[in-house]
């Protein structure tokens, strides 16, 4: 079995685990996640935060978004580029309480209007994932969108953010943790992972 086949099989297993969580458990986890994120020094000092709107039983970020708005922080959401769908690229667009939403080609909610921000101008990025390990490696949905958007962060060495790059924090349920993920050369390593 190839690495790609193994990753696809692992994605399926973890997604099925996630989908078995009841609505109540998902809501409690989302609230607990918001509490954990909001006490992080990286969150407290951040002015521009990228998040996501959950789909496919991903852990929900809406409580983090609401807390960020109350704290006067700017929120941004990923929007898939439509000019070349095969390129698997995305931009981040401002997200406010009144932002109109639509669905992208994967059925995920995203803003239909808003100001774009350069990924390098973000302070904190809350990253969705399917699986993770303790070394900050993640398995995403397989499209490579986050790896492409944040490939410039590979300059970070030994956890030092000397170039004032965005801090990438993966968020997940505990049940999404796996023992070891073999990263590919293009994979972006997360700064940390917060799980509940």
Language-model features, listed with the residues they occupy:
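N-terminal active-site beta-alpha-beta segment that forms phosphate/nucleotide-binding
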Residues: 2-121
